Amino acid sequence: MPSLSEAYRAHPVHVNHKHPDFNSLQELPESYNWTHLDDHTLIDSNNIMKESTTTVPVIDLNDPNASKLIGLACKTWGVYQVMNHGIPLSLLEDIQWLGQTLFSLPSHQKHKATRSPDGVSGYGIARISSFFPKLMWYEGFTIVGSPLDHFRELWPQDYTRFCDIVVQYDETMKKLAGTLMCLMLDSLGITKEDIKWAGSKAQFEKACAALQLNSYPSCPDPDHAMGLAPHTDSTFLTILSQNDISGLQVNREGSGWITVPPLQGGLVVNVGDLFHILSNGLYPSVLHRVLVNRTRQRFSVAYLYGPPSNVEICPHAKLIGPTKPPLYRSVTWNEYLGTKAKHFNKALSSVRLCTPINGLFDVNDSNKNSVQVG
């Protein structure tokens, strides 16, 4: 079975750039200056709280109506936050501490674990960087499988405790992701038994995942810098833990960019492209970006969750019929990563079969229209 790492190796990212020492920069370099930005102001958190229609839904997983609430959030937002999710606060603090410790290392030390162009694991810039003319005020560390080799380079004398945190975090996140997957499917009238690759225990034990540690250093000119440029995730879903520094924004039709405020103990869940496909477009993947702060450093940890890399994903049979044809063709995560590497945010459009027009479907449509996301 092809692994997620092999899928990334098949689509190398060639960006001839190494991170500067962000802390030493007193001015924003031209290569990081996004001068064309005209909507680059964080929405005031007080205004968000007053306007409930512009607040990302927060869902208590102990609520007996959690599945219904999640379905509504997925349909209308493509993103939601969860509380009472079962992940110990101490573990969330441990993984944040690991990220802060890693990104606080001297530049020469971090570069010992640099991700290779055809690799997925290690330290480096955002994989989406090649699609933009300017660089992002960002550094990341991706983990697929064991982090042992890279952590030995970073902490020769003390790597085991860092590895232990990653293993524990991965195990607990995989369980939570499976739970969220079941709730999202249930909201569509689909049971986990309806998913052939769910495994003998119907617990999605064969699912693939990657862990992404993100750092957004304080920036001398945040109004003209971009932490992470707008994109959707290729996943089924992405679970994000963030520190107390705002910056994550999601795009919602009619509202523009909406800030997702950090909640202590809360986790952000993004709908990804593969669930967009599985739901036949009912649950759109969310377009999101990250802005930076003048005086504070933002950290986040993303758990990128998807199917086994060679399993074909298509609109589920329960969601299609004579008046509801499939909008997307079958695609594996492995193949879709290649499509994403080539077409980026037009990847969904490239696997579309037909487009609804005034409530009807043009089955002869050949990817003529762009995908509306958010």
Swiss-Prot record:
Cysteine pairings via disulfide bonds: none
Domain Fe2OG dioxygenase: 206-307
Pathway: Plant hormone biosynthesis; gibberellin biosynthesis
Result when mutating residue 229 to T: In le-1; strongly decreased catalytic activity producing a dwarf phenotype
Keyword match Metal-binding: yes
Catalytic activity of the protein: gibberellin A20 + 2-oxoglutarate + O2 = gibberellin A1 + succinate + CO2
Tissue distribution: Expressed in radicles, roots, internodes, cotyledons, leaves and shoots. Barely detected in developing seeds. Not detected in flowers or young fruits.
Summary of the knockout phenotype: Dwarf phenotype.
Listed EC numbers: 1.14.11.15
Mutagenesis / variant outcome for changing residue 89 to F: Strongly decreased catalytic activity producing a dwarf phenotype
Domain of life: Eukaryota
An MF annotation (GO) of this entry: gibberellin 3-beta-dioxygenase activity
InterPro entries on file: DIOX_N, IPNS-like_FE2OG_OXY, IPNS-like_sf, Iron_ascorbate_oxido_reductase, Oxoglu/Fe-dep_dioxygenase_dom
Residues reported in the UniProt entry to bind 2-oxoglutarate: 298
GO biological process, one term: gibberellin biosynthetic process
Pfam families referenced in this protein's UniProt entry, alphabetically: 2OG-FeII_Oxy, DIOX_N
Residues that, per the record, bind Fe cation: 231, 233, 288
Active site: 298
Cofactor: L-ascorbate; Fe(2+)
UniProt family annotation: Belongs to the iron/ascorbate-dependent oxidoreductase family. GA3OX subfamily.
Additional free-text comment from the UniProt record: The Le gene controls the stem length trait studied by Gregor Mendel in 1866.
Known function: Converts the inactive gibberellin (GA) precursors GA9 and GA20 in the bioactives gibberellins GA4 and GA1. Has a small activity on GA29, producing GA8. Unable to convert GA20 to GA5, GA5 to GA3 or GA12 to GA14. Involved in the production of bioactive GA for vegetative growth and development, but not for the 3-beta-hydroxylation of GA in developing seeds.
Identification of the protein by name: Gibberellin 3-beta-dioxygenase 1
Organism of this sequence: Pisum sativum (Garden pea)
Lineage: Eukaryota, Viridiplantae, Streptophyta, Embryophyta, Tracheophyta
